[in-house]
Structures are given as C-alpha cells and as structure tokens.
C-alpha cells in the first residue's frame, strides 16, 4: 500500500492547479499544521534546547542546559552569508519570556531579554577541546616575522608540556594497532565471564528449587558470607550451659534407680567392634527404648502414695514388720517411773527396706528381660 499513498488524495471538482497550487492551498492549511500558525509573519514554531545554564529574570529560578521549549523562530538579518535567527519562548515557571539570538561572529548565543547566563565558561584548551580558529592570528604569524618569533617560546613550552600526553596517545594507538589480537583477547574475556555467569545462574536456580523460594533474586556471595558460613559449620554442635544441664537431667532421668554396679549408661557395642566405634542403628534404638522404659519406672517411683494396682504391676511385695525382724515396742504406762523403764530393745542389723525392694525388683526385671 505504500506506493498508493501519493494517489489517495481527493481533488474536488472546483480545484484549480493554477489558483490553489496544492490541496493545502485549497483547504487554506499548511503542511506544518500548528507550527506554521504565524508563517505569514515569518515565524515558525520549533523545539529549542537551552544551550547553557541560565537564570530567569522574572522568577529568578535556575534553568538547566538541555531544557526544551516551544520557541518562535524568525530571521532578523545576515552576518555575511550566515542568517541571524531570533528565538522567543515562555518560561515554564512564570509568565516571563526569553529572547535569544544567534551570534555567528563569536560562535555563541546572545541573550537579549528575560534571562542571564550562568557564568561557567572555560578555555577550550583547559578542558582538552579544540578552540575556535582565529584566522587573523594565523595570518599575522605568517606575515610578521617578529610576531612569530615572540610566540615560538610559548610553542616550545607547550610542546614540552604535551610531550608525555602525546607519548601516551601513541602508546594507546600502538597497543590497538593489531586489532585481531585485541579482539581475540576481548572475546576470550567475554567468554570466560559468560561461563562464570551461567554457572552462577545454574547454582542459584538449583538453590531456589531446593528451598522453594520461586524467583527470588539471590545476591552474590561475599567474603563475609563465607566466613559466617564456616563459623556456623564449625560451631553447630556447640551447646550452652543450659543445654548441658538439660542433657544431664535427661540422662539422669533415663537412668535406672535400681541397677547393678556393673551396669553402665552407654549401650554395649558388638563384640567385633573396637572401643571407640560408633554403635549401630539397632543398638541406638535399644538404648533409646531402655532409657524411655527407665524414665517411666522412675516416674512411677517418684510419685507419692503409689496405689496397690501400680505396686502389683511393678512386682512390688509389701512385707510385714515381723518378716523384716522388727519388734514394735509398746507404750509405757503413764504412772511408771523412769527408774522402772525397761531398757530399749536393740534393733536388728538389717538392710534398708527400700534396698530389699530394689533388689527384689531388680531380680524380677532381669528375669523379664
């Protein structure tokens, strides 16, 4: 359809080429539309970009370089064969208008009305830029030998100052002269960096899948992260004082109250294993089950006023006082005197009843085992 764009114009019956010239002339419009609303006055609306920093004289605000305005552009004269243009625009912060003209003689702009320049001018030679060529100075150097002699010393000093800079530029050019080698070296660096980035992305993706954290962005590792991770791995089994106390209580509670002296807390290992060998899974399970059973037994003994049903369940037999060899002394009458008091009966040398019960319970439990 591109070839038909120039043919899809409708020309009405009263259109006359000699009178209207074009469809825009027939409709009384311009090809630039709103930009040419003052074209009869020689004014064209353009987008003007501020060439330097200025101060608005109406609101005293700062307008930075590069700010763009809709400006009215018109031709006001000629400098030799170069036209002089004037730009008029409205401040975007107040009702003030700026008027700026071109100055081809000084390669600059002239601020006519509404604004003032922020003085930040530099000598082109100070900022490593080529300044404007003064043709009169060049012609005077060629025509006046004394004037040229006066400036030879300045040229020599400048050459000595810029010698190091010129050598550096030559070294850079020499280094980049073999473009194939430089390109190969640069591409090799890019390949290594790309490989490293792909490995990092794959490692991060595996970690995100393992932790189920979706598309969370992971930050790169740092030396501080590695140091903290090594400390966590090194001290992960370190326990506090409270942890040691709690483990000691658990070990004591899981220890049988009534046990033989040759029994130990640690589970026995297989006959073929050495003394420092790690117990197998079955041995650890047996030790855990035994510790839980001992805890239940100790808890039943620690409760006061054990019921008869619990005593029967544990295999405890209550013995009478006569069977233990204990003789109960009757109370003396109130009217008896201290001289008539009978001597105290010596208690038989027997072991503690609790030890007897424990011995009996231990024998019964060993038999059950």
From Swiss-Prot:
It comes from the Eukaryota. One of its GO terms (biological process) is RNA splicing. Residues 233-263, 283-297 have a biased composition (Basic and acidic residues). InterPro entries: Saf4/Yju2. Pfam families: Saf4_Yju2. One of its GO terms (cellular component) is post-mRNA release spliceosomal complex. Residues 266-282, 299-310 have a biased composition (Low complexity). Residues 233-369 are annotated as: Disordered. Disulfide bonds: none annotated. Belongs to the CWC16 family. This is Coiled-coil domain-containing protein 130 homolog. It comes from Caenorhabditis elegans.
């Amino acid at each position: 359809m591109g070839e038909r764009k120039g043919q899809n114009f409708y020309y009405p019956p009263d259109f006359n080429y000699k009178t209207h010239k074009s469809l825009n002339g027939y409709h009384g419009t311009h090809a630039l539309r709103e930009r040419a609303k003052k074209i009869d006055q020689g004014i064209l609306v353009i987008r003007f970009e501020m060439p330097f920093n200025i101060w608005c004289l109406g609101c005293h605000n700062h307008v930075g370089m590069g700010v763009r305005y809709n400006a009215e552009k018109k031709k006001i004269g000629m400098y030799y064969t170069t036209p002089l243009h004037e730009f008029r625009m409205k401040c975007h912060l107040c009702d003030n208008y700026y008027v700026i003209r071109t100055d081809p003689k000084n390669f600059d702009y002239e601020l006519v009305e509404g604004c003032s320049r922020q003085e930040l001018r530099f000598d082109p030679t100070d900022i490593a830029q080529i300044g404007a060529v003064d043709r009169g100075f060049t012609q005077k150097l060629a025509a006046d030998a004394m004037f040229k002699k006066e400036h030879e010393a300045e040229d020599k000093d400048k050459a000595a100052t810029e010698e190091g800079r010129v050598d550096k530029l030559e070294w850079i050019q020499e280094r980049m002269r073999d473009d194939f080698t430089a390109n190969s070296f640069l591409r090799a660096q890019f390949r290594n960096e790309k490989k490293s980035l792909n490995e990092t992305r794959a490692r991060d993706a595996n970690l995100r899948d393992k932790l189920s954290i979706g598309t969370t962005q992971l930050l790169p590792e740092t030396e501080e992260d590695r140091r903290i991770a090594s400390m966590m791995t090194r001290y992960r089994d370190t326990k506090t004082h409270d942890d040691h106390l709690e483990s000691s209580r658990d070990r004591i509670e899981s220890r049988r109250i009534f046990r033989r002296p040759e029994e130990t807390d640690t589970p026995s290992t297989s006959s073929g294993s050495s003394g420092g060998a790690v117990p197998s899974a079955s041995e650890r399970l047996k030790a855990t089950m035994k510790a839980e059973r001992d805890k239940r037994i100790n808890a039943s003994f620690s409760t006061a006023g054990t019921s008869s049903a619990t005593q029967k369940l544990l295999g405890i037999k209550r013995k009478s006082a006569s069977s233990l060899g204990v003789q109960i002394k009757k109370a003396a009458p109130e009217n008896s005197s201290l001289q008539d008091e009978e001597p105290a009966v010596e208690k038989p040398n027997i072991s503690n009843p609790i030890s007897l019960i424990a011995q009996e319970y231990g024998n019964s439990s060993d038999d059950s085992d």
